[in-house]
UniProtKB/Swiss-Prot annotation:
Membership in a protein family: Belongs to the glycosyltransferase 31 family. Beta3-Gal-T subfamily.
Ranges annotated as biased composition (Basic and acidic residues): 378-388
Gene encoding the protein: C1GalTA
Miscellaneous: Binding of glycopeptide acceptor substrates to the enzyme is mainly driven by the GalNAc moiety while optimal binding and kinetic parameters are reached in the presence of both the GalNAc moiety and the substrate.
Protein's UniProt keywords contain Protein biosynthesis: no
Name under which the protein is recorded: Glycoprotein-N-acetylgalactosamine 3-beta-galactosyltransferase 1
Membrane topology: Single-pass type II membrane protein
One GO term describing the cellular component: membrane
Tissue: In stage 12 embryos, expression is seen in the amnioserosa and by stage 16, also in the central nervous system, predominantly the ventral nerve cord and brain. Also in embryos, preferential expression is seen in the ejaculatory duct and the nurse cells (but not the oocyte). In larvae, expression is seen throughout the nervous system and imaginal disks. Adult females show expression in the nurse cells and adult males in the ejaculatory duct.
Residues that, per the record, bind UDP: M106, N108, E150, G151, R152, K158, D181, H324, Y325
Residue sites binding Mn(2+) per the record: D181, D183, H324
Transmembrane segments: 22-42
The protein's annotated pathway: Protein modification; protein glycosylation
Lineage: Eukaryota, Metazoa, Ecdysozoa, Arthropoda, Hexapoda
Region (Disordered): 368-388
Length: 388
């Protein structure tokens, strides 16, 4: 065999070897990518939780899995509905007249079609009056264009302008005033039931109570909070004009800032739990509260929640009021499960309505220890709650 033929065979073998190496590399990359995808989608949801930044309340800081909000657009057409012929809604109709609730929804132009209209088509229609607060008008939503910019840094400013608008135009149209986000789902009938004994002239507000930053606690913005008419009056007339009582610039977390303002004008942070000590306002979707160990005990929520909270079915009142981070599609699912699905042969008899309270009087709080916290910036609080 000549030297030239040996050289040619050597080059050929080297080429085949390089080709096999290249193919092996490609196969390895494909397998590695597939394994990585499998690992990501099989990892428990709590691995995606982000640490909470107490000075920034937002999606990236909350215990909400990113995949839960993928289908944000919701249905293009109204899903429709039907009446229940034998349904007895006498009490709900009575409360609709006696406990008037104005619901205002924090939204923005990019969410008008994506989120806000689905609030209007589902739970929003059960409010006595529904108003969308944005920075641009919208004929379908009848949205109010507030004189404030969009973005997280303007949420406090938008909240102030919203309540000023409500006080000027609608203060006598309702007894209670609910603020909710465009991804909050609210069972309005249950809220009326909770509010029924209270006078709207009592300076009080209710929601999911957190304990840092404000001595008496403050209500989570995402879960929604509801102010009495007197609370709105004090906020707009007494707190907002006074920079010593209320932050004048637009920066800051809106739920914390309004909590400080309301405390400064002696509006009480009420206890919204039921008689069994179960919560009614929730900052996450039902799954996150109902499934034990869904959230790591080191997650910020457990340090922020004001009252001791159980996991599992005991987490939540049978008369729960709100959940947060609800996608548009989930709103229709919840609407069906709550207002249409019926187990045959089981009739739910509502509890008797409680007695009315005098102006300034509150229901006694559940006697128990408030939760403690050791996180930076979170005040420790373990004294037994007192009857107000």
């Amino acid at each position: 065999m000549t030297a030239n033929s040996l050289l040619g065979r050597s080059i050929l073998n080297e080429g085949r070897s390089n080709k096999r190496s290249f193919v092996s590399l490609i196969v390895g990359l494909i397998v590695g990518f597939c394994l990585a995808e499998l690992f990501v989608y099989s990892t428990p949801e709590r691995s995606e939780f982000m640490p909470y930044d107490g000075h920034r309340h937002g999606d990236v800081n909350d215990a909400h899995h990113s995949h839960d909000m993928m289908e944000m657009s919701g249905p293009e057409q109204d899903v429709g509905g039907h009446e229940h012929v034998h349904e007895n809604s006498t009490i709900a109709e009575r409360l609709y007249s006696e406990v008037r609730v104005l619901c205002w929804i924090m939204t923005n132009p990019s969410n008008h079609q994506k989120k806000a209209r689905h609030v209007k088509r589902t739970w929003g229609k059960r409010c006595n009056k529904l108003i969308f607060m944005s920075s641009a008008k919208d004929d379908e939503l009848d949205a109010v264009a507030l004189p404030v910019g969009e973005g997280r840094n303007n949420l406090w400013g938008k909240t102030k302008e919203a309540y000023k608008y409500i006080y000027e135009h609608h203060i006598n149209d309702a007894d209670w005033f609910l603020k909710a986000d465009d991804d909050t789902y609210t069972i309005v009938e249950n809220m009326r039931y909770m509010l029924y004994p209270y006078s709207p002239e009592t300076p009080v507000y209710f929601g999911c109570k957190f304990k840092p930053y404000v001595k008496q606690g403050y209500m989570s913005g995402g879960a929604g909070y509801v102010l009495s008419r007197e609370a709105v009056r004090r906020f707009v007339v007494e707190a907002l004009p006074n920079p010593k009582l209320c932050k004048s610039d637009n920066s800051g977390a809106e739920d914390v800032e309004i909590g400080k303002c309301l405390q400064n004008v002696n509006v009480l942070a009420g206890d919204s739990r039921d008689s069994n000590g179960r919560g009614r306002f929730f900052p996450f979707v039902p799954e996150h509260h109902l499934i034990p160990s869904h959230t790591d005990k080191k997650f910020w929520y457990w340090q922020y929640i004001f009252y001791k909270t159980d996991e599992g079915l005991d987490c939540c009142s049978d008369n729960a009021i709100s959940f947060h981070y609800v996608s548009p599609n989930q709103m229709y699912v919840l609407d069906y499960l709550i207002y249409h699905l019926r187990p045959y042969g089981i009739i739910n008899t509502p509890d008797a309505l409680p007695n009315k309270l005098a102006v300034g009087e509150l229901m006694p709080e559940i006697k128990e220890q408030a939760t403690e916290s050791t996180s930076d910036g979170v005040s420790k609080r373990s004294a037994e709650t007192k009857t107000q």
